């Protein structure tokens, strides 16, 4: 009986720990993460203080923080080829990283680190040197900066069959040296690395290439991590938030369901379907059932996005900053509809798949610069600073925990809906105007359309919407308007 009771207790503790790893530890009503892709730590700290905190962003996903290989031309993907776990990259050193985390936490913006637990660097022609000056020999699987030797890796093989579990989880993803996470030494080093980041105050991790690691190995690693630190504003016994990259479009051997009990999982079907709809290939009327009815994960397990740093370079159905009108519309719907753990992208401009982030002649990352409207101008795109996006972050905060009500559509691709009595949004993706009197569910008054303008000192710089005593308002979105969206909420009342 004692053995049974003890085993049952362990199972309950494990289940509770896994459930806790779905909690992103946001402040107040904040509930949107932004990926500041390839930004420097000092610039992120300033962005937290000057923009993200005041605008109500919940957190930042940052690029990998540990030492990576130095590759000719400095392509973005060098950050995904680890050399050691020293916290020195082109984004900054450990002191700068720690300062960023502290300053962002102080203004209610959590930090989530992109971490690479699956692999180390691929083969490199010539001497492989990292961003901290550490030398390695990937060809012989020698990484003295950790240290790892050949026995810490799976035998080299390539992935040819994406329905072969062995190949997916033990062969080398695009030549990257595949760590054996079942080995005690590898587990210890990975846990030490993650615990060090926790000690510095991070709130959690994006786990790159999670499907290429056995879920039981990840369960052990996650379960061995320290609690988040109370001195950084986290409650006692808080577990790090885990969101895992698991690419699963259906019908594959390794599935997302193997990982969702361990933490949130990237919902890749979300971006496919939202891209398909907002490119005009699916009528918006079907979006009324958005979420699990579309085959998506349950909302609390799904990490959602319109695009990410990988797929925006791959073409296809994905929407990116290069199609700005549809991209803003899709992002507005993403942030208005109550489904998933939302992340928005903040990119740099690129012409080809391997383009480096903005850098100077010495190959040092450069800081973003801003025009008089606050938009980035020197190679950084900064979608999170587009009015149509940052104001929808505010909308999402204002309507948090309210349901979709009073759905309206025209039988095609003009839609509108309320979020309880807190907010209202209308979207027009037809080639003709939307001009309707619709139920907004809001108290009577005049509201600022946060898509076309900002509410500044009681005045709206864009369109205003008058709501009558019955909650109804005339809504107009022309087919050729600059934006195909209108959004109002209780915090945007004049």
Swiss-Prot record:
UniProt GO cellular component terms: extracellular region
For the ligand (chloride), the binding residues are 206, 308, 343
Tell me the disulfide pairings in this chain.
48-104, 157-171, 376-382, 418-441, 448-460
What Gene Ontology biological process does one annotation of this record name?
carbohydrate metabolic process
User: Residues that bind Ca(2+), according to the entry?
Assistant: 118, 169, 178, 212
Q: Which UniProt keywords apply?
A: Calcium, Carbohydrate metabolism, Chloride, Disulfide bond, Glycosidase, Hydrolase, Metal-binding, Pyrrolidone carboxylic acid, Secreted, Signal
PANTHER family registered for this protein in UniProt: ALPHA-AMYLASE (PTHR43447)
The molecule here is called Alpha-amylase-related protein
Q: Which gene encodes it?
A: Amyrel
